[in-house]
């Protein structure tokens, strides 16, 4: 924590507005081994506690917060592409990770809003790596397939924000 204290202070001293992303692929290995990462509600609970501690410690210095960067990538590489450990495809696990990351985002947003951590002009969001899908043709099935792709890769994370909350 001392490192981050000094780093944030130096950024501010140099006139640089700090932005904090709470997770960018770096879930602790122990949580992955023990719970299969964000497949578990326990990891969601722990992530929300982690976010709350970060808000307590740094909300007086940081206005811009992000729950996740590219929230669909890790589980896609693990459970759809099977490019990372445990090297098998599991679409149910992939969808559970997506759901739990959206759930965690909502829970963290609630903590941020209701905990008084939002300083003037502060914003909270998620950095989405938009995955574009074009329908193969104009048939209803092609249009539906493109819509579902967009839902599972993009909108699941974008729609976690209510219309009354300023997006980052």
Question: Which ranges hold each PLM region?
Answer:
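Non-catalytic scaffold segments within catalytic domains of secreted glycoside hydrolases
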Residues: 1-168
């Amino acid at each position: 924590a001392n490192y981050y204290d000094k780093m944030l202070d130096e950024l501010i001293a140099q006139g640089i507005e700090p932005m904090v992303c709470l997770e960018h692929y770096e879930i602790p290995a122990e949580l992955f081994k023990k719970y299969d990462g964000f497949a578990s509600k326990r990891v969601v609970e722990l992530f929300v506690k982690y976010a709350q501690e970060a808000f307590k410690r740094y909300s007086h210095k940081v206005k811009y917060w992000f729950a996740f960067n590219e929230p669909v990538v890790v589980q896609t590489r693990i459970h759809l592409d099977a490019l990372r450990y445990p090297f098998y495809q599991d679409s149910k696990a992939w969808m559970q990770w997506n759901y739990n990351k959206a759930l965690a985002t909502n829970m963290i947003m609630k903590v941020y809003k209701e905990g008084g951590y939002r300083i003037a002009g502060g914003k909270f969001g998620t950095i989405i790596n938009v995955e574009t899908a074009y329908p193969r043709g104009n048939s209803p099935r092609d249009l539906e397939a493109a819509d579902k792709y967009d839902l599972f890769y993009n909108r699941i994370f974008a729609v976690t924000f209510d219309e009354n909350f300023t997006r980052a």
